[in-house]
Amino acid sequence: MMLFHVRMNVNLPMTMPAEQAAQLKADEKALAARLQHEGKWRHLWRIAGQYANISVFDVASVDELHTLLTSLPLFPYMQIEVMPLCRHPSSVRDNDL
């Protein structure tokens, strides 16, 4: 498996109807929960004061990450930054593979 640090900034248009925004957010929340339970979306943190998050994904390949990110309901409204991660030799944790 491969770990990726992903920052997602969400920018919904001000003109988007509230009902559409609420449905997109509900769909996103459901998919995010499923992916977390599956172990693919390993960590999810909100960035204080922003409509953004920092996440760690644990997937088999860059292609799988791309497919996963582009399947997110909010993807069309996101600016995404991806950084591949590898284990640091000085880490004292055995489970941060």
What are the residue ranges of the model-derived segments?
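Conserved, structured core segments of small domains
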Residues: 1-97
